[in-house]
Design a protein with these regions (language model features):
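Conserved SAM-binding loop and adjacent beta-strand
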Residues: 17-18, 33-40, 50-68, 72-73
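N-terminal auxiliary segments of SAM/dcSAM-dependent transferases
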Residues: 1-39, 204
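Cytosolic histidine kinase catalytic core of two-component systems
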Residues: 21-22, 62, 111
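Short clusters of hydrophobic/aromatic residues that line enzyme substrate/ligand-binding pockets
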Residues: 35-36, 45, 50-52, 97, ...
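Core SAM-dependent methyltransferase catalytic element
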Residues: 177-205
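Generic structural signal for secondary-structure transition and capping sites
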Residues: 32-35, 125, 168, 197
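Conserved nucleotide-cofactor-binding alpha/beta core module
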Residues: 72-186
Length: 205
């Protein structure tokens, strides 16, 4: 493990931002440098977002860690991710659900789909779909967990409908990140603080 990566993990522990050892081990295991563009490899463990294609970014490591921690993923679960990007978040989720779990990840930008497929070729429990993420993926629903890596103006009902009862969704709404638990069919919100994300867009390109 690089000194920069170790320093990040120690920072999360010391500040209490992320304390779940399983999450920390999954992040430790997945090499972020394999999910950034080649010219940014040396910056892989800077705690900031890095450019990808089509004005998209790979989220900063602390944001990924906080979202993953909030999702409370367990082995064997089925997780829907909206916004594959380079595949980094999906790789971490793959480690957490294990061989009996499944990650369905949707990306609207074809260039990113191709990049993520190359990056995730050794993650056999990850299925990448080129589609409009705002519609979710009904074929595999319902999901134990849903994570959205782009900001919506309000809770997308189509996605929430695909979440199991007592399931958890982590999603940015406007400029705040929320952990939403489905209780008796209704959303229970927990505000995780101020975060900046690219917008959640319809359609595919």
């Amino acid at each position: 493990m690089s000194s920069e990566k170790k320093a990040l993990i120690e920072y999360w522990k010391a500040t209490g931002l992320v304390t779940n050892e399983k999450v920390l081990k999954a992040i430790e295991k997945v090499p972020r440098e394999n999910f950034v563009l080649p010219k940014y490899k040396e910056f892989a463990y800077l705690d900031e977002p890095l450019p990808l294609f089509s004005e998209q970014t790979i989220s900063q490591p602390t944001t990924v860690a906080i979202m993953t921690d909030a999702l409370e993923v367990k082995p064997g679960q089925k997780v829907l991710e909206i916004g594959t990007g380079s595949g980094y978040q999906a790789a971490i989720l793959s480690e957490l659900v294990g061989p009996k779990g499944k990650i369905i990840t949707i990306e609207r930008i074809k260039k990113l789909v191709d990049f993520a497929r190359k990056n995730l070729k050794n993650y056999k429990n990850v299925k990448i779909i080129h589609a409009d993420g705002t519609k979710g993926y009904l074929r595999e629903a319902p999901y134990d967990r849903i994570i959205v890596t782009a900001s919506a103006s309000e809770l997308p009902n189509t996605l929430f409908a695909q979440l199991k009862e007592k399931g958890i969704m982590v999603i940015p709404l406007e400029d705040h990140l929320f952990k939403i638990t489905k209780i008796k069919g209704n959303p229970m919100y927990k505000d995780l603080g101020l975060f900046l994300f690219v917008p959640l867009l319809k359609g595919k390109v």
